[in-house]
Structures are given as structure tokens and as C-alpha cells.
Amino acid sequence: MLLETPAEMALDTAKRFRELRSAKRVTMKALSTASGVPYSTIRRFEGTGEISFLSLVKLTSALGEDEEIRGLFANRTPASIEEVIRGNRR
């Protein structure tokens, strides 16, 4: 699936988050208690994709998926020499 807009990316992220939460058999209420994020915020996020970054970090951590957040802007190893050359031109 090619994501074209920030809104589409946010909705797709919310969908994947909901699937992860469900796979771990964690209810929104239990996640709210564990994370300190209000139930209404979780419900809004899963429905619209809208959430503050800090709340997303808290939810992700409560699900034991801290590495997902840590990997967001991690240094990435270039896949090819062309990528290295392009990067040096910027």
C-alpha cells in the first residue's frame, strides 16, 4: 500500500497499532490504566490517527514495543554506494 498523505499514514499507523493491541489481547481500558493515557485519547487515536507524540510513546511503551519508537529516526545503513553518494550531495 502506497501512503500518499500524512493523514493516510496516520490512519494506517493507528490501524496497525489497534491490530497490535488486539493481538496482545489488551483492552483500551487496560491500556489506559497501564499507560496513563486517557481512554478517550486511545479511542480517538485508533479511530482517526490523531494523537500527541508523547501519548503514542506512552502507549507503545505500555505494550512493550519501545524499540518501535527508538527506531523511528535511527541511523540507517545505506543500501548501496549510490545512496552514499546521493547523501553526500545534500
PLM regions with names:
Residues 25-43:
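Short alpha-helical DNA-recognition segment
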